[in-house]
């Protein structure tokens, strides 16, 4: 996902770490989207699929796989691990419609990163709490960004923020910070 790559690159740029797509290493690689109970399971399953295919091509570089989802409290955590599928079928309008008449619109974005450091696979998770806007707002970002208002923000949706602003608050950046700590890099 190019948008995820942009966010990760923005977050890691301070450390002068270049993030590349798996397609740069192996253009024809195909990963089966696993069904799992949480994002951590999905990310771990994906990295295990990929690692045996590209380990010989990594040349000392580490490998990371990220899976994320939007978990809406009033919907029992839905769409959760099915966020991508739900977005492609009912869209953000479908989520807004499901929340009509509900007072509680709290939600969390969760990002799970599985990464291989050259010796073993590690897992980390980042969270961004917020709420769902009753309408789509903004043109930037992707996925559910037009309806997600982060708790730590100023009332704008992720889509109303530029990439730097969004990255400073995002679940993905929180997970990347934890990954950087495990790899003993300076903080991002």
Predicted regions and their residues:
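Anionic-ligand binding patches
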Residues: 2-188
